[in-house]
Amino acid sequence: METLKNKFREKATALNAEIKDMLAKHGNLKLGEYTIEQIYSGMKGVIGLITETSKLDPIEGIRFRGFSIPELREKLPKAKGSNEPLPEGLFYLLLIGEIPTDEDVKNITIDWQRRSNVPKHVFDVIDELPLNAHPMTQFVTGIMAMQTESEFAKAYSRGISKKEYWEYVYEDTMNLIARVPRVAAYVYRRKYKNNQHIEPNYNLDWAANFAHMLGYSDPNFQNLMRLYLTIHADHEGGNVSAHTTHLVGSALSDPYLSLASGLNGLAGPLHGLANQEVIKWIFQLKENLGGGLPTKEQIAEYIKKTLAEGKVVPGYGHAVLRKTDPRFTAQQEFYRNYIKHDDICEIVQMIYEVAPPILEATGKIKNPWPNVDAHSGALLVHYGMFEYEYYTVLFGVSRALGVLASLVWDRALGMPIERPSSVTTEWIKNYIAKQITEKAK
């Protein structure tokens, strides 16, 4: 699809010139200071990356190219008869920085359909894994097996100029995004549906076709996938999956290797695995409180009991956010618009009403509000997806949109290999002693 590629070329050329001028005039300007505590606490708040696609505000939440989630739900093109945005439109926005037209989105859908064939050896490699392998293990294995198809790796081996890197990364990105739903659906049907696979339906958009290949025909589940794959796509550049994809890509590893690395980070319990932990915790809560619909008072006591046992309330808190995650709110609205009543979703709502003041009262939690994971599992369960381990694969399909759009920008802007400095605790101690001595003089 040369129109999109040419439009990106124009945007990248203009931004490169702007950055070159900015560095010449203001390259020595300091952005701020950081503390020893920040180094020991995951570099939280330390500005160290450039990510063009999105920015996370502690109060407002994520903004994709300046647009909030409510704005995107209103402005992005939608499938006929749907009120939810098409992920193809979000990808266009992340890559180009503009709201696409219906025609722009239709062209991306057609292009991804054209690119979506997955080589047989990819499925053969997945089939060599034991059925009890975690879905993320199978998913990432499939992506690694597809690396044989990397246009960037082939071009780099032939010898290309640095200015050409982004063009081949773009091709890999478009191919990868087209194919990851097929690999993800294959893993789901292999592990949970007795290897009864479903061929793609090219009359459907990217998200609806993914729902179809998973085996879900309910139009509202298709709508859920459109929303889910849109709101999970990007969360600025410092989270583990985005940063890892960027970091590995900075070594000029191709997009297949880079995405697989990022998804391995997403599989961690502190990142993308959290959504399955939330729904498991809610079912434990429900069972311990008698199996029916509990009261707010019962939920409050269960939360206090959870905290007293030294455990966390999954789905609450965020490294950056200090208010309710707008992605949580978007899923709340989906529930009200499409479902009306569901016991698990009602429990999610009651937890939302009682948990924040309890968490805040502990004095240990900076953000007592729900994040995106607090609601997503409940919606999936409503439509019959009880396979909690698989939820992170859905997250991974979505996150590919954001991290790969960023990877194209990384190569277009000529970003160098990432190589920060590191020090030892002994070095820190000596630095502190030196500062104390200097102040005493």
PLM regions with names:
Residues M1-K441:
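Hydrophobic alpha-helical bundle cores within soluble ligand-binding/oligomerization subdomains
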